[in-house]
Amino acid sequence: MNNILLGVNIDHIATLRNARGTRYPDPVHAAEVAERAGADGITVHLREDRRHINDRDVRILKETIQTRMNLEMAVTDEMVSIALDTKPEFVCLVPEKREELTTEGGLDVAGQLEKIKAATQKLTDAGIKVSLFIDADRAQIDATLACGAPFVELHTGHYADAETEEAQQAELEKIASAATYAHGLGIKVNAGHGLTYHNVKPIAALPELYELNIGHSIISRAAFDGLNKAVADMKVEMLDARR
């Protein structure tokens, strides 16, 4: 079975920095440490309210990341313009609400088809690979195909938040089915949201998955074990699931 890649989301390094309005800890430094520890890519979410990652971070990270930069962003003219100026390797289009603590669900691609298709086309024409962050739903996968996006990222939050083993298994089966369906259509499949050291293995074991994007649990463990070890330990969990 092929190995699975780890994209490390470093948003919450910026959250910690912004809590005191200081210049540290710097997400640029975090990206370097994460890459040395085995991260296959670095993910950042430039939110419209700039609550963690800011424009300066995006600009410098694009110049310094040694692996691949994945820029998460809302489908707005401002964000598309920033992406076209920055030219990260990947853009993941996500839904965004100012009042949410974190992204609460997948993008309604089917309900915003023309808007998302237009953004996808602009980014693709600039040589940027586009992923759409969606729930594990066939209608949304079909809409992704219609948009021309080569990647989806399946939302694993419902799986991560399930309160019983039965509910978690049901969510895992939905994700597995969606991954198989998307893969069959020629779409590459990533996944992420709410994944931890305790729940990542069943997701990582799904053979169609190309990459997992994980942030909060890694940054949280880094507070106790250091970022290098936190990233390396997550990579071990994921690769063990593929053996």
Curated annotation (Swiss-Prot):
Feature type site, description Transition state stabilizer: 153
- What pairs make up the disulfide bonds? none
Q: Organism's domain of life?
A: Bacteria
What UniProt keywords are attached to this protein's entry?
Cytoplasm, Pyridoxine biosynthesis, Transferase
Q: Do the record's keywords include tRNA-binding?
A: no
The UniProt record gives the binding positions of 1-deoxy-D-xylulose 5-phosphate as: 11-12, 47, 52, 102
Keyword check for Transferase: yes
Among the Pfam families in the record, one is PdxJ
Provide the Gene Ontology terms for cellular component: cytosol
- Cell location: Cytoplasm
Where, in this chain's numbering, is 3-amino-2-oxopropyl phosphate bound? 9, 20, 194, 215-216
Q: Please give one Gene Ontology molecular function term for this protein.
A: pyridoxine 5'-phosphate synthase activity
Q: Which reaction does it catalyse?
A: 3-amino-2-oxopropyl phosphate + 1-deoxy-D-xylulose 5-phosphate = pyridoxine 5'-phosphate + phosphate + 2 H2O + H(+)
- Could you tell me the Gene Ontology terms of the biological process aspect for this record? pyridoxine biosynthetic process
Stated EC number for the protein is: 2.6.99.2
Annotated metabolic or biological route of this protein: Cofactor biosynthesis; pyridoxine 5'-phosphate biosynthesis; pyridoxine 5'-phosphate from D-erythrose 4-phosphate: step 5/5
Q: What is its main location?
A: cytoplasm
* InterPro entries linked to this entry: Aldolase_TIM, PyrdxlP_synth_PdxJ, Pyridoxine-5'_phos_synth
Family that this chain belongs to = Belongs to the PNP synthase family.
For this protein, the record's PANTHER family field holds: PYRIDOXINE 5'-PHOSPHATE SYNTHASE (PTHR30456:SF0)
Q: How does it assemble?
A: Homooctamer; tetramer of dimers.
Protein name (record): Pyridoxine 5'-phosphate synthase
* UniProt organism field: Photobacterium profundum (strain SS9)
- Lineage of the species this protein comes from: Bacteria, Pseudomonadati, Pseudomonadota, Gammaproteobacteria, Vibrionales
Q: Which gene encodes it?
A: pdxJ
